Amino acid sequence: MTTFSPREIVSELDRYIVGQHEAKRAVAIALRNRWRRQQLEPDLRDEVMPKNILMIGPTGVGKTEISRRLAKLAGAPFIKVEATKFTEVGYVGRDVEQIIRDLVEVGIGLVREKKRAEVQAKAHMSAEERVLDALVGATASPATRDSFRKKLRDGQLDDKEIDIEVADTGSGMPGGFEIPGMPGANIGVLNLSEMFGKAMGGRTKKVRTTVKDSYKELVRDESDKLIDNEAIQREAVRSAEDDGIVFLDEIDKIAARDGGMGAGVSREGVQRDLLPLVEGTTVSTKYGPVKTDHILFIASGAFHVSKPSDLLPELQGRLPIRVELRPLTKEDFRRILTEPEASLIRQYKALMETEDLKLDFTDDAIDALADVAVHLNSTVENIGARRLQTVMERVLDEISYNASDRAGVSVTIDAAYVREHVGDLANNTDLSRFIL
């Protein structure tokens, strides 16, 4: 897992997300506390529980983006789920324990990649031997093999096509059956296919590919022969238990809004099912039982219709750290357009450059774009930074359409150009409701 300090985590998030310093600080501290806990004595380590976070803020201000970037930074099993996808146990749909099963699967993938990297050199040598077998046959003389090995390493044979046999990882059966009342619903089918695969020595398939492309498949194949699957599973379960992070998006959508019956009952049921998960329980997975006591939960929601106090009191108590994300201002929109590494303006410039069309935005154009976005958010519906994409598409519609006919041309976009293309719509509220 990551050993970044909280300040380093925040500065890394700053590269992609504008503002929201308080939310970044909260997740940075929570992430660093995972590492701090690992340094403690075992007795005390078991007692230190993660402080779960609730992020509150309107749509389009960076809640989900913070989680996406955090996942890449974490270096630990991380899963983002929408709370609305789950239903109360006994209803048709996914139950909340599936979150933990998915988290373990993510852990398996992370640990496997790490183990593959450790045996990379050895696997590469074995892969080279298999490529030589495909090129000159297993019975070729050492002199012939050495001659071809030299050509292979010099890249002279990169484009030559060969037939290789690799493990067939695709299951012949569908992903599994949802069996009511059975935890880990689809484990039956997966275990059966694994058992048959092992009994028959593992299925292989023939693939025709170039020498250069074959290495990727063969190195992975050889790496998997060198690593111990049971050790990977044990390590992944431990990693999910100690370092796992679950990001629960749209938590406000399952908050009870009224005391009535109907769908609200099921929503409250999902909250009740989440309680033991967040508090700490044991979930059975096909890799063995997984304890959720030390998994960090970060919940987020816009809370437009409901309030955080509409959540079950027990669930509120299990989300002790509250962070409020503020709505975006005109200055924020300006910064979003220009500052992040993959800012919208940079993206559009790069897209147009593929057609050999040079795009330039003046400072007053950026001001005008931010003005239009703020105006529309205040008069139509506040959808945060996502409004900029709509406005940009509208402004650049004509340029994008004709770009292939204007190769070698330079286009400068200024405030007048922006107003000409979205000014009327932005001022006409009835029209902008439908178009922007």
Curated annotation (Swiss-Prot):
One of its GO terms (molecular function) is ATP hydrolysis activity. It is found in: Cytoplasm. GO terms for biological process: protein unfolding; proteolysis involved in protein catabolic process. GO terms for cellular component: HslUV protease complex. Keywords: ATP-binding, Chaperone, Cytoplasm, Nucleotide-binding, Stress response. Its main location: cytoplasm. ATP binds at V18, G60, V61, G62, K63, T64, E65, D249, E314, R386. A double ring-shaped homohexamer of HslV is capped on each side by a ring-shaped HslU homohexamer. The assembly of the HslU/HslV complex is dependent on binding of ATP. ATPase subunit of a proteasome-like degradation complex; this subunit has chaperone activity. The binding of ATP and its subsequent hydrolysis by HslU are essential for unfolding of protein substrates subsequently hydrolyzed by HslV. HslU recognizes the N-terminal part of its protein substrates and unfolds these before they are guided to HslV for hydrolysis. PANTHER family: ATP-DEPENDENT CLP PROTEASE ATP-BINDING SUBUNIT CLPX-LIKE, MITOCHONDRIAL-RELATED, ATP-DEPENDENT PROTEASE ATPASE SUBUNIT HSLU. Belongs to the ClpX chaperone family. HslU subfamily. This is ATP-dependent protease ATPase subunit HslU.
